[in-house]
Design a protein with these regions (language model features):
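Conserved catalytic-core segment of nucleotide-activated headgroup transferases in glycan assembly
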Residues: 1-18
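Conserved active-site histidine-acidic residue motif and adjacent donor-binding/catalytic loop
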Residues: 13-26, 42-43
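Flexible glycine/serine/alanine-rich "lid" or loop that lines and gates the nucleotide-sugar donor pocket
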Residues: 26, 52, 69
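Hydrophobic acceptor-binding patch used for acceptor engagement in glycosyltransferases
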Residues: 29-34, 56
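Nucleotide-sugar-dependent
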Residues: 34-45, 59-73
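Short hydrophobic beta-strand element within catalytic cores of glycosyltransferases
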Residues: 52, 56-59
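A charged, aromatic-enriched C-terminal amphipathic alpha-helix characteristic of glycosyltransferases
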Residues: 94-125
Length: 130
């Protein structure tokens, strides 16, 4: 409905090279990843990439993921609320930008190679592997 109302331009990114996919994500204001729990529990590399680019990212986070990662920057959507959540964002450019910035900071904190390496090193050290 939103596309036919000319409120959004929908770009399905699939069956293209990684470099083309990255370029198209970079041009997005909003990125929608997994809805319907078909690709996993909550988010995947597509979402990490879009967040790292500062793109507002929507995905379906189940209750387990929400409790495990309560500080995530995703806008949690499902098939029932996707349209209404998109309408909220479309009418609030500042929220889109704020979510994008929050996502970028979150990826730097949770997925940056140095931070992950430090966490793993400390864990391995604590269990006697190092």
């Amino acid at each position: 409905a939103l596309q036919s109302e000319r409120k959004i331009e929908f770009d399905l990114i699939e069956n293209v090279s990684h470099s083309v996919a990255i370029d198209r994500k970079l041009k997005s204001d909003i990125f929608i990843d997994q809805i319907g729990n078909k690709g996993g529990w909550g988010y995947g590399m597509n979402s990490v990439e879009s967040l790292s680019m500062g793109v507002c990212t929507l995905t379906e986070m189940n209750d387990v993921y929400n409790s495990f990662i309560p500080d995530h920057p995703f806008i949690n959507v499902n098939s029932e609320n996707l349209d209404s959540e998109l309408r909220i964002l479309i009418n609030n450019r500042e929220k889109i930008l704020a979510q994008g910035e929050a996502g970028k900071r979150w990826v730097e904190k949770k997925h940056d190679i140095k931070n992950v390496a430090d966490i793993l090193y400390n864990y391995y050290e604590s269990i006697g592997l190092l």
